[in-house]
Amino acid sequence: MRNGTSLLLLAAIALAGAACLTAMGGTAKAAALEPTDSGAPSAIVMFPVGEKPNPKGAAMKPVVFNHLIHEKKIDNCETCHHTGDPVSCSTCHTVEGKAEGNYITLDRAMHATNIAKRAKGNTPVSCVSCHEQQTKERRECAGCHAIVTPKRDEAWCATCHNITPSMTPEQMQKGINGTLLPGDNEALAAETVLAQKTVEPVSPMLAPYKVVIDALADKYEPSNFTHRRHLTSLMERIKDDKLAQAFHNKPEILCATCHHRSPLSLTPPKCGSCHTKEIDKANPGRPNLMAAYHLQCMGCHKGMDVARPRDTDCTTCHKAAPKSAD
């Protein structure tokens, strides 16, 4: 009975605490999210916490970290909590940097790439380095990401630096001071997550079934590129991927690997609009048309570890032209 009484007391205390947080506007919205297996909050707001006693404002919006999604994808908590202590990142890494975090600023901790492997202990990963690792190692991502690098502009930053507009200046100030109540933090995070909408993919039926590449037909017959088949395959591979859904926030983005360096569009210009048959003397760094085709096709196949067609077998993609009777 003692154990039973203790359990009842613990349950009563937990319910009372939950009621208090709900009364303060804390966990009501957060409860709408699926709970994590670890017991950590399903989502939290990561504020740019600084060392200054009363900082004013911040250069960037806070980041809402969806702990639930990441927990499902990562086997070991120490992948992110590399010290083994599951505390907030800003405990050691602040805007200015502090001794506890080897003076590595919050910005570096979240965005650093090419992190050197530690001789002992866990090698830290940043948000950006982990995402980049995923796009390089997973076949469904590597095909495109092996040949293009996303432009790191304001739109790229806003994928993560995005929070509900209902957050007040007072809450922002408390957040960067490190004094925002956990319940209020989780409520803001949940509201942001619940407001996110998945971008509807473009229908493959809008794309050409085949594209005849004949601009360079000479020794070989025109190449019949199975455009819709390639597009459908790519879409099928990433349709349920949360990382792709987050960064492919416009349906045309999937087209932008091949149809690069032009405005996002479902009707992009032809490759020959920019790439000429001969090297353009005014733009010597721009590949000619034949090089552009082969860099794209072979680069994607290599990134996805596609065994066929082989780079050395020209007739797999375009048959040899019949020899003239002469």
Curated annotation (Swiss-Prot):
Name the Pfam families for this protein: Cytochrom_CIII
Which keywords does the record carry?
Electron transport, Heme, Iron, Metal-binding, Periplasm, Repeat, Signal, Transport
Q: Tell me which residues bind heme 4.
A: 141, 144-145, 248
| List of residues binding heme 2 | 82, 89, 92-93
UniProt's post-translational modification comment states:
Binds 9 heme groups per subunit.
- Which residues of this UniProt protein bind heme 8? 230, 297, 300-301
State where heme 1 binds.
67, 77, 80-81
Location(s) in or outside the cell: Periplasm
Which annotated residues bind heme 5? 111, 157, 160-161
Q: Which residues bind heme 9?
A: 294, 314, 317-318
Q: Which SUPFAM superfamilies match?
A: Multiheme cytochromes (SSF48695)
InterPro entries named among the record's database cross-references: 9HemeCytC (IPR054980), Cyt_c_III (IPR002322), Cyt_c_III_dom (IPR020942), Multihaem_cyt_sf (IPR036280)
Q: Identify the main location.
A: periplasm
A molecular function (GO) held by this record is: heme binding
Where do the annotations place heme 7 binding? 260, 271, 274-275
Gene3D superfamilies attached to this UniProt entry:
Cytochrome C3
**Can you tell me which residues bind heme 3?**
70, 127, 130-131
Q: Which GO terms describe its cellular component?
A: periplasmic space
Which residue ranges traverse the bilayer?
none
| Protein residues bound to heme 6 | 227, 255, 258-259
Signal peptide positions (record): 1-30
Checking NCBIfam families in the record gives: 9HemeCytC
Anything noted about its domains? Arranged into two tetraheme clusters and the extra heme 4 is located asymmetrically between the two regions.
Q: How does it assemble?
A: Monomer.
What role does this protein play?
Answer: May form part of a transmembrane redox complex through which electrons are transferred to the cytoplasm for reduction of sulfate.
The name this protein carries in UniProt is Nine-heme cytochrome c
Native organism is Desulfovibrio desulfuricans (strain ATCC 27774 / DSM 6949 / MB)
